[in-house]
Regions:
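Active-site neighborhood of HAD-like aspartate-dependent phosphohydrolases
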Residues: 2-47
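A short acidic (Asp/Glu
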Residues: 18-20, 64-69, 125-128, 206-207
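Short, basic/hydrophobic alpha-helical segments
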Residues: 38-49, 102-110, 199
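Substrate-recognition element of Asp-dependent hydrolases with the DxDx(T/V) motif
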Residues: 48-66
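C-terminal cap/substrate-recognition subdomain and adjoining C-terminal extension
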Residues: 67-156
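Amphipathic alpha-helical coiled-coil segments
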Residues: 161-178, 182-185, 214, 218-221, ...
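Alpha-helical coiled-coil oligomerization motifs
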Residues: 176-179, 183-186, 190-193, 197, ...
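Long, low-complexity or tandemly repetitive, helically biased scaffold regions used
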Residues: 190-212, 216, 226-274
Length: 300
């Protein structure tokens, strides 16, 4: 069993994420798994010859969980895992990394033959083989796929390559907040128009709710853009994005009622939409530059 490449697979935070549970009705066959994550994982396993899956997730401990996972794998053309990692008791110093190390020892597999897909970091001396995903931010994404392919093909992870992957992950986090903000603003604008046309209390409430939601995502993007800028600095890129939407969007028409204030709020929602859309375009362009840089090409 010591030939080929091995993927040690966690499930929660890799093949699903916190948004998955809001969409359970979409697919009742595997409501705890995300179709987009499964599709990307399928792409990964079919892009590498002689690759094997070893299940390291806590799902391996519950038969019904494994049955659901196997059914989802079958639908997405993913081969079933060849084995599961051993379960270590807490008195044995149980960590995910130690369980994987135990499996490697028992099966005579080298560390450079493996990658680990997991949202946890308790990997002991295997952290350099970890591709860490994020349960709160989409699980297994395109950037993780690219990193996994890079490692499984035996490419050396240089400092520059590592920094590019980190910048790409930061770009994805930033885009996630920006797209959520834009969706909330789009909804707020629709409710705002209805409110101006005399929609009543419900329309006003829904408008305010969506504006508040957008403000949360806009506030969140501040931290993600700061991290993105830092990662870009590490790869000699630059970014300059301004999203000054202002607190007035939150509360202006809470205390004042009238057509002038309603139009003022509507105007500022439109301004915020434009700012967020421009920021998305800028980040998407920089992401494209990073991907070309990763592939050894350049974009003017």
């Amino acid at each position: 069993m010591n030939k080929g490449k091995y993927i040690f697979l966690d499930v929660d935070g890799v093949l699903n994420h916190h948004e998955t549970y809001k969409k359970k009705h979409v697919n009742s066959l595997y409501p705890d798994l995300d179709p987009e994550c499964l599709a990307l994982f399928s792409k990964l396993v079919h892009s590498i010859d002689y690759v094997h899956i070893v299940l390291s997730s806590s799902w391996r401990l519950i038969e019904s969980d494994m049955d659901r996972l196997e059914a989802a794998f079958k639908e997405f053309g993913i081969p079933k895992w060849i084995d599961i990692t051993p379960y270590l008791e807490y008195e044995q110093g149980k960590t995910r990394g130690k369980e994987i190390n135990q499996w490697l020892k028992e099966n005579h597999v080298r560390k450079d033959q493996i990658i680990i897909l997991d949202d946890n970091t308790d990997m002991a001396d295997l952290k350099n083989r970890l591709i860490q995903t994020d349960f709160m931010n989409g699980g297994f994404k395109e950037v993780h796929l690219k990193k996994a392919l890079h490692m499984l093909k035996g490419n050396h992870m240089t400092k520059e390559t590592k920094e590019i992957f980190e910048a790409l992950e930061a770009a994805n986090n930033t885009l996630d907040n920006l797209y959520k903000a834009l969706n909330a603003l789009d909804s707020a604008k629709s409710w705002s128009i209805a409110d101006i046309l005399g929609g009543g209390f419900l329309m006003t409430y829904m408008k305010r709710s969506r504006v508040k939601e957008a403000q949360v995502y806009i506030d969140n993007r501040k931290a993600s853009i700061e991290k993105f800028a830092k990662e870009l600095h590490d790869v000699n890129e630059d970014i300059n994005i301004s999203l000054d939407t202002g607190e007035f969007i939150k509360f202006a028409d809470y205390f004042f009622d009238g057509i002038l204030v309603d139009w003022y709020v509507q105007s500022n929602i439109t301004t915020a939409q434009t700012q967020v859309s421009n920021a998305i375009s800028r980040v998407e362009h920089i992401k494209e530059l990073l991907l070309h840089k990763l592939n050894g090409a350049s974009v003017q």
